[in-house]
């Protein structure tokens, strides 16, 4: 049986850790000069020893590479690779991760800030799980940031992943070619495939261990805006009314077909009966199957809907039922 675990907050000491487990940090950069030093400094201040810091730059045109080389000159753990041509953040992360030689791999963005005990807590928690991830803070400033606590059930991962910058992964898992799928965000692919390799998939630390800085130049935001320009106002009724058409449009995309066919193929075991059914419904163009998918999402809304506080009462049932349309509205995750 696959396992998902949530680790409760509790005090840890370095003496309790398995200190012989080695950790590599993998960071991908592109024109990140503004916030790069702050992130590198937070990695170097970790309470758990970092064995190597692999930074792969994707043809930056600012001073990013010069900053990286200055850190490498001062600290032998920092290894800088500069791509000959631009790969894009998905392929860049895949390429960089394959260069790690440690027991565990931690993924890092170029503009975040890590809490000093991030890696310490994750090494303690991961055990035999493929992935350990944590809550994170998100906002333009640390003081004004809010906590993000993504879902990691396989039902939730049918509709999107949790952030790569919160992940610590077993190297023997993350370096498998078959856990990296083309056409969707790499962290969504890793989260999904954690369920299809071994009995222990994902463990979750319910405490923010990094600050994900929101700013206009962050890579995921730019990717999303390249597909869907920012709306003039926050959507209210639009996902409920227009989401069905968006869902049908997404179904025609090759990346959609590959993803849900992959899930369908890997959920034939009876323990994945619910997810096998959901994948089949995601691929179907029959309007009646859409009703069944919506009903399943309503029934399992507390495991699927991103905000647990909004799953109660009549409106919670409506949100759960309409989740496939809400998910599809302005979705850019199949346009990589």
Predicted region positions:
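Conserved donor NDP-sugar-binding/catalytic core segment of glycosyltransferases
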Residues: 117-145
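Conserved nucleotide-sugar donor-binding catalytic segment
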Residues: 98, 153-229
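C-terminal subregions of glycosyltransferases and related glycan-biosynthesis enzymes
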Residues: 8, 184, 196, 200-202, ...
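Short, well-formed alpha-helical segments that are part of the catalytic scaffolds
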Residues: 32-45
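A conserved acidic beta->alpha catalytic loop
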Residues: 57-66, 85
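Short aromatic/hydrophobic "clamp" motif used to bind/position activated sugar donors
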Residues: 105
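Cell-envelope/extracellular polymer assembly enzymes that use nucleotide-activated donors
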Residues: 21-24, 52, 189, 193
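Glycine-rich, basic loop-to-helix element that forms the pyrophosphate-binding segment
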Residues: 83-100
């Amino acid at each position: 049986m696959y396992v998902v675990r949530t680790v409760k907050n509790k005090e840890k000491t370095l003496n309790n850790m398995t200190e012989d487990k080695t950790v590599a940090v993998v960071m991908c950069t592109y024109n990140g000069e503004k916030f790069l030093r702050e992130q590198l400094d937070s990695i170097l201040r970790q309470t758990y020893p970092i064995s190597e810091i692999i930074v792969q730059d994707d043809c930056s045109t600012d001073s990013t590479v010069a900053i990286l080389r200055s850190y490498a000159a001062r600290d032998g753990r920092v290894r800088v690779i500069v791509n000959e041509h631009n790969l894009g953040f998905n392929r860049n992360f895949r390429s960089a991760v394959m260069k790690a030689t440690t027991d565990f791999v931690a993924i890092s963005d170029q503009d975040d800030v890590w809490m000093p005990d991030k890696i310490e807590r994750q090494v303690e928690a991961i055990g035999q799980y493929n992935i350990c991830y944590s809550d994170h803070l998100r906002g333009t400033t640390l003081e004004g940031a809010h906590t993000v606590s993504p879902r990691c059930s396989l039902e939730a991962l049918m509709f999107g992943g949790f952030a790569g910058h919160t992940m610590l992964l077993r190297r023997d898992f993350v370096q498998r070619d078959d856990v990296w799928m083309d056409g969707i965000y790499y962290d969504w692919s890793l989260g999904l495939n954690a369920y299809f390799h071994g009995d222990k998939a994902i463990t979750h630390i319910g405490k923010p261990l990094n600050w994900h800085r929101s700013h206009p130049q962050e890579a995921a935001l730019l990717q999303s805006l390249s597909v869907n320009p920012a709306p003039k106002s926050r959507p209210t009724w639009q996902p409920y009314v227009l989401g069905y058409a968006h869902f049908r449009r997404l179904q025609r995309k090759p990346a959609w077909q590959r993803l849900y066919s992959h899930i369908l193929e890997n959920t034939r075991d009876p323990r994945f009966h619910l997810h096998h059914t959901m994948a089949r419904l995601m691929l179907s163009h029959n309007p009646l199957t859409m009703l069944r998918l919506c009903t399943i999402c309503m029934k399992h809304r507390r495991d699927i809907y991103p905000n647990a506080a909004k799953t109660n009462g009549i409106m919670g049932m409506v949100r759960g039922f309409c989740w496939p349309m809400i998910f599809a509205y302005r979705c850019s995750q199949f346009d990589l």
